């Protein structure tokens, strides 16, 4: 690797520059850092969008874990995934296929001479989520996931026959989910083997891929829309595969129940659930969502999480460890811990587990014995920021990748007994777009809420001076079981909003996660109750205690449940405290909740079905006539056509009411976006309109000549008045 030039990615701290929407969107986005077996270097990918070329470029780099320097490994954007086979040997996915349109290829190469690799396999469809294990014979067993036909063959969209009719016919729900309409194809995990050749001959595909999921009727893995490689695992010896699937026997729109399945890599047996209703080891009364199966280093145990409730997606996750072949009840590990971890790894000796969990507005790492009793309290060994990935190094330390409110990429090493050991790289010291951002840009406070102390973040603007006053931005998060965390977001980034000339306050009210399950659960059938009280008390705390915040010219914004709360605030006394409101994809008409796709969510939140508990659905109705009569604050409504969680009719209904009531309002719509706005060009318009709207009514547009304006958007405005 010495033939490459290593580049330093450290830079001297400098005066912070305002983070503009353009900089937020075009700043390089890096993946997790994956170390090689020697622990000397780590590989990571980078992608970057340009508003000059209107294209995204991507490349792979190596990070020297000793010096923090990087070098480009390859500029080939078709390299989509990389897996280390040895200190220098790499297996990667080429997202194109020279022989099969719509297929992909597996290549083997060396990190020291990447361009000299060779094709080991041509796969007949699009696959991702590659995991691989070397066997004692030297063969490589691998798994990846793609789309499947009902008969188990891989689905290739480019080669599929286009139907003559666009009709869709359904006899059961789901009909649609998140942003897609369900069809007869589904996700499935496929297995394959790369056979090691003799002498100088390289690896080649041995036989055909095997579908490990399709033999189980109605199973699917990974489960869309957010499922991925964490939904399955390959044992270190390559013999077994574990995968998660929703319960095949239950209506998928009504239950969150899912099981962990175990199947031989060679598909010689049909996958069986280890925690299904008829499995001998299933813990009594545990019927909720299962997740994150991970094999132990010697492959004889499997760690995973499961929730208790079969209709509650935000129930507390509990860690379980299954012994392969055992018929005993699967034991929980630290089962009483009042946190909900969502990632797990075994230490190399198989005695300890490392888990990642939301905790007090962060995502931290904790360690615990693999056989810990239920009353054990896991120990945290990371602090600020939010961990997104972690890998063991040869010295038993962990290479951690994360982010914070002030950086979109942070790499460091840590150990359970020592905490953070060494900082290796951080984007705010690398990228000109994030130049000078740092921990001093944020603070936090607690205040007395409806029934307990509530946490809130404070994000300061560029060149903040506490002797001055800055208008308030009041951020309300979605979920509702979610939180504002010390982590980077390219969609709702409080620093980008603050740098228009505001102080952003982002509270974690009733319903928030990471502060104990009681706070999370307390929002059930209470959407406009305790959370609203918390927000009122937060506003009052800011008004009375933060002298540098101008609450007389404040604004509020929120998405999803946060959009609902903005709609609720519009008809409440708190709405008169703000100069402008921004509601993104929020529910407005109580009776429209039945049009969502994940019916378990609304039925659990409001304690019953739409017909049995109608009063509960209507209790917190922003569209109630008496509330509409209070609407007065200028409001931007954002809603997109492919949002099937909260259909676009919700936003249109709200806009219609605002217009007819004479409230200054604007409707922003994206026909090709879902619950989120992710296309870079659309994201720029989203930021220009949202920031331009609040700047207009807060007065920032006049006080800050560099502030974003509604006129910055090149899209024409339709106005027949």
From Swiss-Prot:
Annotated S-S bridges: none
Modification(s) after translation: N-glycosylated.
Glycosylation sites: 75, 94, 151, 254, 380, 450, 607
EC number: 3.4.14.-
InterPro entries assigned: 6-blade_b-propeller_TolB-like, AB_hydrolase_fold, PD40, Peptidase_S9_cat
Subcellular location: Secreted
pH-dependence of activity, as noted: Optimum pH is 6.5.
Keyword RNA-binding: no
Single GO term (MF): serine-type endopeptidase activity
GO biological process terms, semicolon-separated: proteolysis
Lineage top rank: taxon: Eukaryota
Keyword DNA-binding: no
Gene3D superfamilies from the UniProt entry: alpha/beta hydrolase (3.40.50.1820), TolB, C-terminal domain (2.120.10.30)
Family membership: Belongs to the peptidase S9C family.
PANTHER family: DIPEPTIDYL-PEPTIDASE 5-RELATED, SERINE PEPTIDASE S9 FAMILY MEMBER
Functional summary from the UniProt entry: May be involved in metabolism of dipeptides or may affect host defense mechanisms. Has a substrate specificity limited to the hydrolysis of X-Ala, His-Ser, and Ser-Tyr dipeptides at a neutral pH optimum.
Record protein name field: Dipeptidyl-peptidase 5
Organism encoding this protein: Aspergillus fumigatus (strain CBS 144.89 / FGSC A1163 / CEA10)
